Amino acid sequence: GNRVTCRDWFQLSLKEGLTVFRDQEFSMDLCAEPSARAVKRIEDVRVLRTAQFPEDAGPMAHPVRPDSYVEINNFYTVTIYEKGAEVVRMMQTLVGRAGFAAGMKLYFERHDGSAVTCDDFAQAMADANPASELARLLPQFKRWYSQAGTPLVKARGVYDAAARSYTLSFTQSCAPTPGQAVKEPFVIPVAIGLLDAAGNDLPLQLPHWQQAETGTRSFVLTQETESFTFVNIDAEPVPSVLRGFSAPVVLDIDHTDDQLLHLLAHDSDPFNRWEAGQRLALRRALRAVQADGPVHAPLDAPVLDALRHVLHHPTLDAAFKELVLTLPSETYIAEQLTVVDPQRVHAVREAMRDQLAHALHDDWVWAYEQHQDNGAYRPDPRSTGRRALAGLALHMLCLAARENGNPVWPGKAYQRVKDAGNMTDRFNALSALVASGQPLAQEALGRFRALFKQDALVLDKWFALQAGQPDRGGQVLPLVRQLLAHPDFQIKNPNRARSVIFSYCNANPGAFHRTDAAGYVFWSERVLEIDAFNPQVAARLARALDRWKKLAEPYRSAAREAIARVAAKSDLSNDVREVVTRALAE
């Protein structure tokens, strides 16, 4: 950004998308094992799915290169940054890593000291790689810059035993977004592998290829409907599609539970291995959300056994195991539904978490004892992973203790708050106590604050942990109001405001979406209060109700009323007015 900058604000993703991509690649390069490298990729995709995909589907949807804006502050978004990084990543996929390096070299040679556009960047990449798919498809590829929305890719596989062939058929579409009713097909690189019954990658060969290639191969979708037929396939394979999350799309693929269990156990692509576990859990969560009556244990024995197997796997990275054993978030579950009852979603996910804590209790004990870090602190990826898995195990053991009354694990967590040799372990232990509603949590919170009350960033974490805790009976909103009155809380400090207000309104749906609408009243009060002195922060908070039209009643009407209450204020900033006006637009 210092050597080559943006010609105008519409080109913001030119440097911000590239910066995010560079950071992602650097972080992955610090890791050794493929499953450790995949941890960063998975974390980035979780942000896309829980923040950017909803933005693409909501009233503030905009292309990576917006066409217009009321207030530029509202376009420092996950679309500009994170989706922008995915566009850069797809370029790298289409030209290869060496080709991407050549493209960057040409870009800087051409434009050093200049203010340029997204088109200039894409052109440099294509010109440095004239024989690449990117160069051939450049005008169509640039639709990623001009079209808003998340493409939906449907994949269906058919095996022909007589011909010893397997055909994967793809259909791409993209829903209308504000101001863009019709979408043209995108260029979508889809990384594919096929697994045999033993879990090995099969050699991939199309009819016109001279020889097969084993492992992952990228195929490029450019039309609404396309098919690829693989030959010399002796038995029906299990497809592993969109490996490494090769494009920012929603994948609809008709895997059976057995196929997903096979991928979870064997897929050589760590991302899709994690994805198989998420799909198994998500499938059960949605089934439980849509069922009538009380929520019963949603996870069945095959899934629990598969997760147990991952936990004990001898070669998988500990950080990767922690991600596989972490259930899909309430936000992600809700995004899969047409109509959302936030309290039902919250109840289902809590039931799944409690079930996982109890069913794998002895395994969590093993995981904690094997991975707790009592030696000198080391910031390397392997040690980071061990701390993450030990933290999840302690969290689960404190959850189980809440039900069975066993004081041992809450006691160990409290001791860890007192004597941990690093912040990660100390905060994980505090989180385990707070999230499981343990009586020791209050004492631990007091001790933690006493230790770190001079450190503003740590105190932000302390506030956020309390405002973001699971709601058990409506206690979180009164607590949040108490935190606003805390002597260490200053609403004019953006980080402190985010730590309490955003942690509640934007990141704690089970507590925010109350049947009495008190969460929405609190939200509207805070948006108006903050708008008076910091419109940019207020506009970010205003977006907590972007997806109000998906809500079931009584939430939907109450949310609309709260948004209208904000919109009715005569002296709103442009920042907030743009957000609430677009939210209310039919």
Listing of model-derived features with the role each one plays in the protein:
Residues E133-P139, T150-V241, L286, I333-A334, ...:
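Beta-strand-rich binding/interaction modules
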Residues T117-P139, W144-Q172, K183, A281-A285, ...:
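His/Asp/Glu-rich metal/cofactor-coordinating catalytic motifs and the adjacent surface-exposed loops
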Residues C6, F10-L14, F100, G113, ...:
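Short, surface-exposed helix-loop/turn micro-motifs enriched in polar/charged residues
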Residues F10-Q11, P54, T79, Y145, ...:
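A general structural signal for short secondary-structure junctions and capping/turn motifs
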Residues T50, T77, V231-E586:
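Long, ordered, helix-rich scaffold segments
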Residues F10, G17, Q24, E86, ...:
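Structural beta-strand/beta-sheet cores of well-ordered domains, especially the beta-sheet scaffolds
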Residues Q24, D67, M91, T171-S173, ...:
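Structured loops at beta-to-helix junctions and adjacent beta-edge loops in soluble globular domains
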Residues G1-V158, T167-F170:
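Hydrophobic alpha-helical and helix-loop surface patches within well-folded domains
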